[in-house]
Amino acid sequence: YDYWNDKVRRSLLFDAKADYLVYGMAEKGILGIASYLRSMTNDECLMTNEGVAARRYCNTAIITKEISKYKDALVLSSYEEVAADKRKYAESFKLYYTEGRKKQPRVIIQPCQGRYLVVFPPENLKQKEFEALFELPFMRASRSGNIPAWDFVKFSTISHRGCFGGCSFCAISQHQGKYIVGRSLASIKKEIQEKIMVQSGFKGNILDVGGPTANMYGLTCSKDEGCTRASCIYPNFCKFLNLTQKPSLELLKELRQMPGIKKVFIGSGIRYDLALLDDEYMEELVKHHVGGQLSIAPEHICEEVLLLMGKPRFSKFLEFKDKFEKLNKKHGKKQFLIPYFIASHPGSTLDHALKLAFFLKKNRVRLEQVQNFTPTPMTPATCMYYTGIDPFTGKPVHVPKGEERSFQKALLQPQLAKNYRLVAKALKQLGKGKLLKQLTA
């Protein structure tokens, strides 16, 4: 689904008219294709499509007219069918998405206008392969001009890839996978010593140690074949998931004890439902690893919306907030939570937005930035947005569109003068115009 054109389009590979497409992190796929091309003559390069198809390079997609060789493949409804029928679209999305949750996904095929899109499954790097990336001689400098995020990135390090949170609006697991691939402590320390500490401007602070979710480091699935769950921790914790926060604790303790290191911060955010499982982790987090502010993502307060988002119950956020504040007081810290909320997510009504607005008002939270949900390819939330259907249950979902999107976003920032008219109009539509002064004061 293409949000900008508001229509279902063919695979990007068809529209780009390329021979093949490489998706995700894809280091293995890229190396395989590069090695294959290097071995060919110029004339043979004209036949690369069939060569790539024969070798089934991971993280790669091709177009072909013949699929009989892919006996075990998952064949989806055709492009023509999903473009014409929203329920078919939702059903095909569910099949595609759940297949991608497996440890060993099948080849996925979609017929399209007399040809076939063939997508070869991803293959995660092993730990040693992942660590080898950080040994490569990257310059660690911008090619030209200033990059605003660079001041943060150059003094940060990546501890792992993958995320099993399963948030409906996020595509990270589609790119990096659901299963965590982490680096060893030795690999991370070596990078810090040899590549970060030697950079000009380094003052002893590591600004972030993390990945998509910092406190998923070292958490593994004990089930060899994996499963098709979208999330390992929602709506409940999977019994096959190793839930300990000990790997994160040990990593952070070791790094902050390195000579020349003053502080080690977590800047990439954590899952608070995981953090609450370990009192020692919470204690260490507040005492040593918050740089004044900690990013956290409750996203909403209404359970109906959180269910569709794949986020923990709001009571978990309140529990975390209470514990965070008590630990700050205990250790004499003045540190703050920066909560992220999304407006206009599928399933969110104006009533839901108003409840969130009054929660923020009651707790004296003034949001400087609000994300108005924007559909992005490959996510369950985008499927809901386009079809109005929850692909996992088949039930209809309210989808905020048009002016309602502006209303929902404005309700979360009623203090802004530019939003006054929108807030007034939204309240009038709800039959609650008398609340305008109370909300905007």
Model-derived features: where do they sit?
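Glycine-rich beta-alpha loop elements in corrinoid/cobalamin-binding modules
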Residues: 1-40, 46-112
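Amphipathic alpha-helical packing elements
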Residues: 12-24, 412-441
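Conserved, mostly hydrophobic/aromatic
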Residues: 19, 188, 296, 370, ...
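Terminal amphipathic helices with adjacent charged low-complexity linkers/tails
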Residues: 54-83, 97, 122, 180-232, ...
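N-terminal [4Fe-4S]-dependent radical SAM core
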Residues: 94-156
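N-terminal pre-triad scaffold of radical SAM enzymes
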Residues: 146-171, 203-208
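Conserved SAM/AdoMet-binding glycine-rich loop
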Residues: 193-338, 343-346
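Catalytic cores of alpha/beta
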Residues: 280-281, 345-361
